[in-house]
């Protein structure tokens, strides 16, 4: 997993400036002109505009295809270098006037992964500008290890009579 400072630098924030602080819970926040970046100790990244006139994270236009590409590119930048097998895919697009939300979910070998806390990522646009982004920083990997759904004693208790645990 990449450090909060590395993620901040990847997004163009100065991780060594005076506008960086970490609270007692381990949440790190970076503030720079137009945006606030927060990375929680639990692995949730939030990027939000602190004014309405931002251009730093912006799509080419307000067209849906450009917004989706901007959101995908932003998420790709944040997750680059991850060795995880799961990937984020667009699963929903919500439009309400000038506001558009691109919703992404993690998929592992074509199977959706729904972490506690909602969708894998949500990128909110006002016009063509990103006004808020939320990403659950997760790394799902495939394994060949067999995992029991139930402990053996419980599994045996629900087996039909005459059956054996395999």
Feature-to-residue mapping (PLM):
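Preferential activation on post-signal-peptide N-terminal prodomains/segments
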Residues: 1-77
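Single conserved position on a long alpha-helix in the C-terminal lobe of the eukaryotic protein kinase
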Residues: 119-121
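Segments that shape or occlude catalytic/ligand-binding pockets
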Residues: 53-60, 66-115, 127, 131-166
